[in-house]
Amino acid sequence: MTNDRFGLRWGLAGGTTLASIDEARASARFAEAAGFDSFWISHATGVDPIVTLACLGSDFPGISEVGTSVVPLYGRHPVGLAQLARTAQNAVGGRLTLGVGTASKRHVEGALGLSWDKPFSYAREFIEALE
């Protein structure tokens, strides 16, 4: 017996973004029918991945894990992100994995107008606040 697990990631690295919750639902339905163990949504310019996964709720019992890959920390507050993740975790029956990261200097400074000073320290402090 093997412990291999396979997931489907949809979003930025997949070459597209999810434009709607219905599109995410169709993608998750495909993942479940194809036998994938997990379903992941990237944070990009489409729908919010955490809200979308919460909306999918328990529609797909054959998928053992749903997750974000990756939610950028800059531009969010730890309390708000923790509350959002906790709500989604409840909606999906404890199957959520929250993937987070700093994004890129170009995005943080250019799109958000924030300082890219010490991004790893920023991420560490943010994650500690989430806990």
Predicted features by range, described:
Residues 4-19, 75-131:
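Flexible, glycine-rich active-site loops centered on histidine and acidic residues
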Residues 1-68:
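N-terminal beta1-alpha1-beta2 module of alpha/beta enzyme domains
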